[in-house]
Amino acid sequence: LRDAQALQGLIQRGVEAFGGVDILINSAALFQRAGLLETTETIWDDQFAVNLKAPFFLAQAFARALPPDRRGHIINLADWRALRPGAAYVAYYLTKAGLVALTQSLALALGPQVQVNAIAPGAILPPPGGDEYFKKVAARIPARRVGSPEEIVKAALYLLDSDFVTGEVLLVTGGEHL
């Protein structure tokens, strides 16, 4: 996901395999705990390459490959912390805030042919060994539970079904963002 040419090739393989691509979901992400003082250049570069550079160049390749008579959708998986960052994952939060800005810029640049939106999940899948932490998270959010991958799928299906939603960030947090 670091090589813009390889990303172009991914879209091209999709076009060749399926006769075209009209949906792009950017969901790959690196999530590495590193505060301001712990963030190295390598952590910074890795986070930005996967979380922001790849979605940009995939969207560019997608837009170039989409025939002018077809409509398309791009959905970027952001994070609710893009809108309310903390201190523990500085580079990650910055990349997800950048992904929200990219979502809105792409909606302006590619509309009306392509609708571009983001989903900003809250607590969905615990990190390895994070089950106890997720229990604490669930206790403090209004839904009193963490989400499931199926809820992200439902949000994506809503965005794909809509023909009037673009440039939006759909929070799927159970109220964790409040």
Q: Model-derived features: where do they sit?
A:
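Conserved NAD(P)H cofactor-binding loop of Rossmann-fold oxidoreductase domains
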Residues: 27-32, 174-175
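Substrate-binding pocket helix/loop in short-chain dehydrogenase/reductase
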Residues: 35-36, 43-48, 129, 137
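Active-site helix of classical SDR
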Residues: 59, 95, 103
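Short, small/polar-rich loop/turn modules that mediate ligand/substrate recognition or access, typified
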Residues: 111-115, 166-168
